[in-house]
Amino acid sequence: MPPGVNIATIFMLLVILVAIGLIWLHHARALRGRITPQRPLPALDALRAALGRAAETGQAVHLSPGASVLGASSGVRSAATELVAGLLLAEQAAAQAARNGTPILVSSGDVVAHLALRGGIRQAFQQAGQAQDFEPARVQLLTHHDELAYVTGVTTLYGRQPLEASAMLGGFGQEFMLVGEDGAQRGIPQVVGTTSTTGLPLMLLTTPATLIGEEIYASEAYLAPSGPAQARLLTQDVLRTAVIVLLIGGLVYSLIQPYLGLPPLPGL
């Protein structure tokens, strides 16, 4: 190999090219209607049903990506991927709400998330042809970089007006017990999800409609029509399967390598 060429860099470029190719392939398949059947996620079925009921009752559905932040420093929960998953779910739910005429109430605990929500939900209403129904006041910033203050603000929203349901996906920890228990006592159906090992047990205690771990990253594709979201989900599944196969293959190779006199794997 020529001097100055990094094997790791070449490998990463190949992975990126493969990922782009898979997204393009799956997007083309989705546009042709060739979508792989998805396993059911009851929590998202409950959210879909709540959006339909809210159009009839006139009660709002609360949407939230939590109090996760982007580019968090030490001492602040860094859950950028969870935040993005929550933002995408909120936008897809808002798009469905715009088509159904469902009132929504959106809250966040980070300035960046708040701006992203306002822009994304405005765009969702515009694409649904209901731009006149978008109300900026329905997208609220409750706090900034303070998880406990944020869930306290959500409980205030719960007590201020009747809600048809509340969907909260993002970075939640022990503070979720405050809002989860309050919602359960008020009889508000809650659809929740996180990857946090401290937040998940509390979610399972307060609501059966819980997305566990990586299920939150698939939520957008379950609510979105066929297209880019489906392509991203299928690509993630393929890459995840490939990583698992490589890990198992590497483990087996490392076990048999000393006995068969095979060359060691690079970097080991």
Model regions and ranges:
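Hydrophobic alpha-helical transmembrane segments of small proteolipidic membrane proteins, enriched
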Residues: 2-42, 256-257
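Membrane-interface segments at loop-to-transmembrane junctions
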Residues: 38-47, 231-236
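Acidic, Ser/Thr-rich low-complexity segments on the non-lumenal side of membrane proteins
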Residues: 47-93
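Gly/Ser/Thr-rich loops at beta-strand to alpha-helix junctions
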Residues: 66-72, 83-84, 110-114, 169-176
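Long, charge-dense
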Residues: 96-98, 102-151
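Membrane-proximal low-complexity regions enriched in glycine and acidic/polar residues
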Residues: 128-186
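Extracytoplasmic/lumenal ectodomains and periplasmic regions of secretory and membrane proteins
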Residues: 165-214
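C-terminal functional extensions of proteins
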Residues: 198-200, 204-268
